[in-house]
Protein backbone atom coordinates (compact mmCIF):
# COMPACT_ATOMS: atom_id res chain seq x y z
CA UNK A 1 0.00 0.00 0.00
CA UNK A 2 2.91 2.16 0.43
CA UNK A 3 7.62 4.43 -3.74
CA UNK A 4 10.69 6.69 -4.31
CA UNK A 5 12.28 8.63 -1.52
CA UNK A 6 15.17 8.44 -3.91
CA UNK A 7 14.04 11.89 -4.98
CA UNK A 8 15.40 13.10 -1.66
CA UNK A 9 18.36 10.75 -1.31
CA UNK A 10 20.99 12.28 -3.58
CA UNK A 11 21.00 15.78 -2.11
CA UNK A 12 24.60 16.64 -2.96
CA UNK A 13 25.96 19.93 -1.72
CA UNK A 14 27.25 22.54 -4.15
CA UNK A 15 30.01 23.21 -1.60
CA UNK A 16 31.55 19.77 -2.14
CA UNK A 17 34.60 19.16 -4.33
CA UNK A 18 34.17 18.94 -8.15
CA UNK A 19 32.64 15.78 -9.59
CA UNK A 20 35.78 14.79 -11.50
CA UNK A 21 37.74 14.50 -8.22
CA UNK A 22 35.25 12.23 -6.48
CA UNK A 23 35.04 8.46 -6.39
CA UNK A 24 31.83 6.54 -5.93
CA UNK A 25 29.37 8.05 -3.45
CA UNK A 26 26.78 5.85 -1.73
CA UNK A 27 23.70 6.81 0.28
CA UNK A 28 21.01 4.76 2.00
CA UNK A 29 17.79 5.99 3.63
CA UNK A 30 15.31 3.95 5.66
CA UNK A 31 12.02 5.84 5.80
CA UNK A 32 8.30 5.63 6.47
CA UNK A 33 5.41 6.78 4.29
CA UNK A 34 2.25 7.75 6.18
CA UNK A 35 0.10 6.73 3.26
CA UNK A 36 -3.58 7.27 2.47
CA UNK A 37 -5.42 5.84 -0.55
CA UNK A 38 -8.00 7.29 -2.95
CA UNK A 39 -9.51 5.58 -5.96
CA UNK A 40 -11.18 2.30 -6.84
CA UNK A 41 -10.26 -1.35 -7.28
CA UNK A 42 -12.06 -3.92 -9.44
CA UNK A 43 -11.56 -7.59 -8.55
CA UNK A 44 -13.44 -10.53 -10.10
CA UNK A 45 -15.45 -7.97 -12.04
CA UNK A 46 -16.68 -6.21 -8.86
CA UNK A 47 -15.73 -2.55 -8.43
CA UNK A 48 -15.30 -0.92 -5.02
CA UNK A 49 -13.99 2.38 -3.64
CA UNK A 50 -10.78 2.41 -1.58
CA UNK A 51 -10.85 5.86 -0.01
CA UNK A 52 -8.80 5.10 3.09
CA UNK A 53 -6.85 7.39 5.43
CA UNK A 54 -3.61 6.57 7.21
CA UNK A 55 -5.29 5.75 10.53
CA UNK A 56 -7.09 2.79 8.95
CA UNK A 57 -3.92 1.64 7.16
CA UNK A 58 -2.02 1.81 10.47
CA UNK A 59 -4.67 -0.22 12.29
CA UNK A 60 -4.49 -2.95 9.63
CA UNK A 61 -0.69 -2.95 9.29
CA UNK A 62 1.15 -6.13 10.33
CA UNK A 63 4.63 -5.30 9.07
CA UNK A 64 6.25 -2.83 6.68
CA UNK A 65 9.73 -2.02 5.44
CA UNK A 66 10.90 0.86 3.25
CA UNK A 67 14.40 1.81 2.12
CA UNK A 68 15.90 3.82 -0.71
CA UNK A 69 19.50 3.98 -1.87
CA UNK A 70 21.64 5.55 -4.57
CA UNK A 71 25.20 5.67 -5.88
CA UNK A 72 26.91 8.23 -8.09
CA UNK A 73 30.24 8.77 -9.80
CA UNK A 74 30.65 11.87 -11.92
CA UNK A 75 27.45 12.72 -13.76
CA UNK A 76 26.06 9.17 -13.83
CA UNK A 77 24.43 7.23 -11.04
CA UNK A 78 21.86 4.61 -10.17
CA UNK A 79 19.13 4.43 -7.55
CA UNK A 80 16.65 2.01 -6.06
CA UNK A 81 13.66 1.93 -3.76
CA UNK A 82 12.04 -1.05 -2.03
CA UNK A 83 8.71 -1.08 -0.19
CA UNK A 84 6.92 -4.02 1.40
CA UNK A 85 3.70 -3.97 3.44
CA UNK A 86 1.54 -6.72 4.93
CA UNK A 87 -1.94 -5.64 6.02
CA UNK A 88 -5.03 -7.32 7.42
CA UNK A 89 -6.27 -8.27 10.88
CA UNK A 90 -8.26 -11.38 11.70
CA UNK A 91 -11.73 -10.74 13.14
CA UNK A 92 -14.91 -12.53 14.06
CA UNK A 93 -18.26 -11.52 12.58
CA UNK A 94 -21.36 -13.32 13.87
CA UNK A 95 -19.19 -16.07 15.29
CA UNK A 96 -17.46 -16.66 11.95
CA UNK A 97 -13.71 -16.07 11.74
CA UNK A 98 -12.62 -13.85 8.85
CA UNK A 99 -8.97 -13.46 7.90
CA UNK A 100 -8.34 -10.87 5.14
CA UNK A 101 -4.75 -10.13 4.10
CA UNK A 102 -3.18 -7.81 1.53
CA UNK A 103 0.51 -7.89 0.67
CA UNK A 104 2.10 -5.16 -1.42
CA UNK A 105 5.64 -4.91 -2.78
CA UNK A 106 7.18 -2.15 -4.91
CA UNK A 107 10.70 -2.44 -6.26
CA UNK A 108 12.02 0.51 -8.25
CA UNK A 109 15.41 0.69 -9.96
CA UNK A 110 16.99 2.97 -12.50
CA UNK A 111 19.64 5.49 -13.31
CA UNK A 112 20.11 9.22 -13.51
CA UNK A 113 22.27 11.74 -15.35
CA UNK A 114 23.34 15.01 -13.75
CA UNK A 115 22.40 17.74 -16.20
CA UNK A 116 24.14 20.48 -14.24
CA UNK A 117 24.47 22.57 -11.10
CA UNK A 118 23.85 26.31 -11.08
CA UNK A 119 24.57 28.77 -8.28
CA UNK A 120 21.68 31.02 -7.33
CA UNK A 121 23.86 33.62 -5.60
CA UNK A 122 26.93 35.65 -6.57
CA UNK A 123 28.28 35.65 -3.02
CA UNK A 124 32.07 35.17 -3.25
CA UNK A 125 33.31 31.84 -1.95
CA UNK A 126 29.85 30.47 -1.31
CA UNK A 127 28.55 27.26 -2.87
CA UNK A 128 24.98 27.89 -1.80
CA UNK A 129 22.27 28.59 -2.65
CA UNK A 130 22.43 26.42 -5.78
CA UNK A 131 20.22 24.10 -7.80
CA UNK A 132 21.15 20.72 -9.31
CA UNK A 133 18.98 19.07 -11.99
CA UNK A 134 19.02 15.33 -12.81
CA UNK A 135 17.28 13.38 -15.56
CA UNK A 136 15.81 10.06 -14.34
CA UNK A 137 14.98 6.75 -16.04
CA UNK A 138 14.08 3.31 -14.75
CA UNK A 139 11.23 0.95 -13.92
CA UNK A 140 8.91 0.04 -11.04
CA UNK A 141 7.77 -3.52 -10.32
CA UNK A 142 4.45 -3.85 -8.47
CA UNK A 143 3.21 -6.99 -6.71
CA UNK A 144 -0.25 -7.19 -5.13
CA UNK A 145 -1.60 -10.24 -3.34
CA UNK A 146 -5.02 -10.29 -1.67
CA UNK A 147 -6.44 -13.23 0.26
CA UNK A 148 -9.80 -13.68 2.00
CA UNK A 149 -10.25 -16.69 4.27
CA UNK A 150 -13.77 -17.08 5.72
CA UNK A 151 -14.34 -19.95 8.13
CA UNK A 152 -16.51 -22.61 6.50
CA UNK A 153 -16.22 -21.11 3.02
CA UNK A 154 -13.72 -21.39 0.18
CA UNK A 155 -10.54 -19.35 0.37
CA UNK A 156 -10.37 -16.64 -2.29
CA UNK A 157 -7.15 -15.01 -3.45
CA UNK A 158 -5.87 -12.76 -6.23
CA UNK A 159 -2.34 -12.02 -7.43
CA UNK A 160 -1.23 -9.26 -9.77
CA UNK A 161 2.26 -8.36 -10.99
CA UNK A 162 3.32 -5.72 -13.48
CA UNK A 163 6.30 -3.60 -14.54
CA UNK A 164 6.16 0.09 -15.46
CA UNK A 165 8.92 1.95 -17.34
CA UNK A 166 9.53 5.41 -15.85
CA UNK A 167 11.09 8.71 -16.97
CA UNK A 168 11.36 11.86 -14.91
CA UNK A 169 13.46 14.64 -13.44
CA UNK A 170 14.34 16.15 -10.10
CA UNK A 171 15.63 19.50 -8.90
CA UNK A 172 17.80 19.61 -5.76
CA UNK A 173 18.13 23.00 -4.06
CA UNK A 174 20.98 23.64 -1.61
CA UNK A 175 19.56 26.49 0.46
CA UNK A 176 22.36 26.69 3.04
CA UNK A 177 25.09 24.55 4.58
CA UNK A 178 22.45 22.51 6.41
CA UNK A 179 19.12 22.97 4.62
CA UNK A 180 18.03 21.60 1.26
CA UNK A 181 14.85 21.21 -0.83
CA UNK A 182 13.95 18.52 -3.38
CA UNK A 183 11.32 18.44 -6.14
CA UNK A 184 10.84 15.13 -7.97
CA UNK A 185 8.46 13.89 -10.64
CA UNK A 186 8.11 10.97 -13.02
CA UNK A 187 5.61 9.43 -15.41
CA UNK A 188 5.40 5.98 -16.93
CA UNK A 189 3.45 2.86 -17.70
CA UNK A 190 2.56 3.84 -21.26
CA UNK A 191 0.52 0.65 -21.65
CA UNK A 192 3.50 -1.62 -20.93
CA UNK A 193 2.28 -2.34 -17.40
CA UNK A 194 -0.07 0.36 -16.17
CA UNK A 195 -1.99 2.37 -18.71
CA UNK A 196 -0.41 5.36 -16.97
CA UNK A 197 1.37 6.11 -13.71
CA UNK A 198 2.81 9.27 -12.19
CA UNK A 199 4.66 10.29 -9.06
CA UNK A 200 5.41 13.63 -7.38
CA UNK A 201 7.54 14.30 -4.33
CA UNK A 202 8.40 17.50 -2.51
CA UNK A 203 10.75 17.28 0.46
CA UNK A 204 13.02 19.24 2.74
CA UNK A 205 16.09 17.98 4.55
CA UNK A 206 18.51 19.04 7.28
CA UNK A 207 22.17 17.92 7.23
CA UNK A 208 24.07 17.08 10.41
CA UNK A 209 27.12 15.19 11.61
CA UNK A 210 26.70 11.50 12.43
CA UNK A 211 29.68 9.74 13.96
CA UNK A 212 32.86 11.44 12.67
CA UNK A 213 32.06 12.73 9.19
CA UNK A 214 30.68 16.26 8.82
CA UNK A 215 27.18 16.62 7.37
CA UNK A 216 27.02 12.93 6.40
CA UNK A 217 23.43 12.42 7.57
CA UNK A 218 20.14 14.16 6.85
CA UNK A 219 16.70 14.09 8.38
CA UNK A 220 14.34 14.29 5.42
CA UNK A 221 10.60 14.86 5.29
CA UNK A 222 8.01 15.86 2.77
CA UNK A 223 4.91 14.80 0.87
CA UNK A 224 4.62 12.16 -1.80
CA UNK A 225 1.89 11.02 -4.20
CA UNK A 226 1.86 8.07 -6.60
CA UNK A 227 -0.94 7.19 -9.04
CA UNK A 228 -1.33 3.87 -10.88
CA UNK A 229 -4.00 2.93 -13.43
CA UNK A 230 -3.56 -0.77 -14.21
CA UNK A 231 -6.05 -3.14 -15.88
CA UNK A 232 -6.02 -6.87 -16.57
CA UNK A 233 -8.63 -9.34 -17.78
CA UNK A 234 -12.31 -8.76 -18.58
CA UNK A 235 -15.79 -9.66 -17.40
CA UNK A 236 -15.83 -11.66 -14.17
CA UNK A 237 -12.04 -11.98 -14.37
CA UNK A 238 -11.43 -8.24 -14.65
CA UNK A 239 -8.93 -6.63 -12.31
CA UNK A 240 -8.34 -2.87 -12.18
CA UNK A 241 -6.15 -0.85 -9.81
CA UNK A 242 -6.96 2.85 -10.32
CA UNK A 243 -5.52 4.28 -7.11
CA UNK A 244 -3.63 7.32 -5.84
CA UNK A 245 -1.46 6.79 -2.77
CA UNK A 246 -0.35 9.93 -0.95
CA UNK A 247 0.87 11.20 2.38
CA UNK A 248 3.80 12.59 4.40
CA UNK A 249 7.19 10.87 4.42
CA UNK A 250 9.92 10.91 7.07
CA UNK A 251 13.34 9.30 6.87
CA UNK A 252 17.02 9.33 7.78
CA UNK A 253 19.59 9.46 4.97
CA UNK A 254 23.15 8.29 5.69
CA UNK A 255 26.23 8.64 3.48
CA UNK A 256 28.28 5.43 3.54
Model-derived segments and spans:
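Transmembrane beta-strand segments that form the barrel wall of outer-membrane beta-barrel proteins
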Residues: 180-195
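Short glycine/proline- and aromatic-enriched beta-strand/turn motifs that initiate or cap beta-hairpins
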Residues: 13-84, 249, 255
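Transmembrane beta-strands of outer-membrane beta-barrel pores
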Residues: 32-36, 73-75, 82-88, 106, ...
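Residues that define the transmembrane beta-barrel architecture of outer-membrane proteins
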Residues: 22-24, 61-65, 72, 103-107, ...
Amino acid sequence: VVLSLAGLAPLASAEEKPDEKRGWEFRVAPYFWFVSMDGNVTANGQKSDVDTDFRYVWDELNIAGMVTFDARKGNWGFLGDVIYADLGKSRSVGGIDIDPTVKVAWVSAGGFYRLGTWKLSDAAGKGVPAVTVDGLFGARYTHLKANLDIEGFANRSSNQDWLDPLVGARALFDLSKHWMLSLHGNVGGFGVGSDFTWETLCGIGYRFRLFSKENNARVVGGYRAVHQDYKDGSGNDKFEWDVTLHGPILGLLIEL
